[in-house]
């Protein structure tokens, strides 16, 4: 079908659509409705319902480069064509305008609800998958933090015995703990971002049960985790300084002798004390007994915290690693499924209602066509007719016919009995004696 003459096509109550003639409109509708080529023979219709029309709309990508006003016009034409195609299939019962509109819009509304339910379930699965991956990462980070705590405790325990081994264990454990803390912070940020994005998408599909604000409220657990992260990073930097000091001391044999004397006796000459204190200030070698006890207690507390986090993550993975956001999205999808079932039942009930209305209307029409005569009216049927008897000769009696046609009894009217014959009357054809 060639395209008609280009012109401005205007729909009543809307703006003018420039450059779209009547032939172009028919060509576009055929492209959308029938799914065939624009130029060529029209194939058989493959999209008989509004749902398939919407799917064809998306597949053909005809609206990707169309202005919003033009898209509105084309949408109007599409709906007009749909109403024309579905007019014959609309039930003719005594339905209200609202019920007829419901029957017209139900396929589109059903398609939208099915798409929303599918998208909500997909979002919930994505949130659970992301949460499971981040939980495994947090599990590894917690185990690394626990190993870091063990190494710090061993470094403190070996400080009086070996200076190099103690500093090496302490620095490695502190660095590993800082890396684990940073990993936990990053996983928390990524999980919050994933949940926020999923909730933003779900809020466009339906109302959520709980409100969510990106920067609302104070999350004390995240603040605590950030504090531990900063503390471990500071300790890691200090451990690097301790290792650097140990390497400097190891390169000088005389200085190492003074360090060993300081570690054994806690006493060195006053002219060299300042250099030793400056070299090992804040290290495990320069700790007093009280500081050593406090350091061991802090390392033990961090070790217990990392072990508790590890066990919680492990148990959460065994339970399926489900999040509250995913459960809320699935609850919303379940609610939409219930609404879809209710609308489907109502859609099935309307054609039955229309058919029952049509049958009752036909019954009333048949009953109204019958003529009921009033009481006392005369029957249109003739009275009983006696069979015709030929005139007989003299001396032959008249025979009474065996069969007579009886008149039907009408409502409120009985046929009058025949008059009795007079005694002095003789039968015709007989002569007096």
Curated annotation (Swiss-Prot):
Transmembrane segments: none annotated. InterPro entries: ApoL. The keyword Transport applies. Residues 346-433 are annotated as: Disordered. One of its GO terms (cellular component) is cytoplasm. It holds the Pfam family ApoL. It comes from the Eukaryota. Signal peptide: none annotated. GO terms for molecular function: high-density lipoprotein particle binding; lipid binding. Coiled coil: none annotated. Residues 359-371 have a biased composition (Low complexity). Low level of expression; detected in uterus, testis, skeletal muscle and stomach. Residues 422-433 have a biased composition (Basic residues). It is found in: Cytoplasm. Keywords: Cytoplasm, Lipid transport, Transport. One of its GO terms (biological process) is lipid transport. Belongs to the apolipoprotein L family. May affect the movement of lipids in the cytoplasm or allow the binding of lipids to organelles. This is Apolipoprotein L5. It comes from Homo sapiens. The lineage of its organism: Eukaryota, Metazoa, Chordata, Craniata, Vertebrata. The gene is APOL5.
């Amino acid at each position: 079908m060639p395209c008609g003459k280009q012109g401005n096509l205007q729909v009543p109550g809307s703006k003018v659509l420039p450059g779209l003639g009547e032939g172009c409109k028919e060509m576009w509708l055929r492209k959308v409705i029938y799914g065939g080529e624009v130029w060529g023979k029209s194939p058989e219709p493959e999209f008989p319902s509004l749902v398939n029309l919407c799917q064809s709309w998306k597949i053909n990508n005809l609206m990707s480069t169309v202005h919003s006003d033009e898209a509105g016009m084309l949408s109007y034409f599409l709906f007009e064509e749909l109403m024309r195609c579905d007019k014959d299939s609309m039930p003719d019962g005594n339905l209200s305008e609202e019920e007829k509109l419901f029957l017209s819009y139900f396929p589109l509304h059903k398609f939208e609800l099915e798409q929303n339910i599918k998208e909500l379930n997909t979002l919930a699965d994505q949130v659970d998958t992301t949460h499971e991956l981040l939980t495994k990462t947090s599990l590894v980070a917690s185990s690394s933090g626990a190993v870091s705590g063990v190494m710090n405790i061993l470094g403190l325990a070996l400080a009086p015995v070996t200076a190099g081994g103690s500093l090496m264990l302490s620095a490695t454990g502190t660095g590993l703990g800082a890396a684990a803390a940073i990993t936990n912070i990053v996983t928390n940020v990524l999980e919050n971002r994933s949940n926020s994005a999923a909730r933003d998408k779900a809020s466009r599909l339906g109302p959520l049960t709980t409100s969510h604000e990106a920067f609302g409220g104070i999350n004390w657990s995240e603040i605590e985790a950030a504090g531990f992260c900063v503390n471990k990073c500071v300790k890691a930097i200090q451990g690097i300084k301790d290792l650097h000091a140990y390497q400097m001391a190891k390169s000088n044999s005389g200085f190492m002798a003074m360090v060993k004397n300081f570690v054994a006796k806690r006493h060195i000459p006053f002219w060299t004390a300042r250099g030793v204190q400056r070299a090992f200030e804040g290290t495990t070698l320069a700790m007093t007994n009280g500081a050593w006890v406090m350091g061991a207690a802090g390392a033990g507390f961090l070790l217990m915290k990392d072990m508790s986090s590890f066990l919680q993550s492990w148990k959460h993975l065994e339970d399926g690693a489900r999040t509250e956001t995913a459960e809320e999205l699935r609850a919303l999808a379940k609610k939409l499924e219930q609404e879809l079932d209710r609308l489907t039942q109502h859609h099935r009930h309307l054609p039955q209602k229309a058919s029952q209305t049509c049958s009752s209307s036909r019954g009333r029409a048949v009953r109204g066509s019958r003529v009921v005569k009033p009481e006392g009216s005369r029957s249109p049927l003739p009275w009983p007719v006696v069979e015709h008897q030929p005139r007989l000769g003299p001396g032959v009696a008249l025979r009474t016919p065996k069969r007579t046609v009886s008149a039907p009894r009408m409502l409120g009217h009985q046929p009058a009995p025949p008059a009795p014959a007079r005694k002095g009357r003789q039968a015709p054809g007989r002569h007096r004696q």
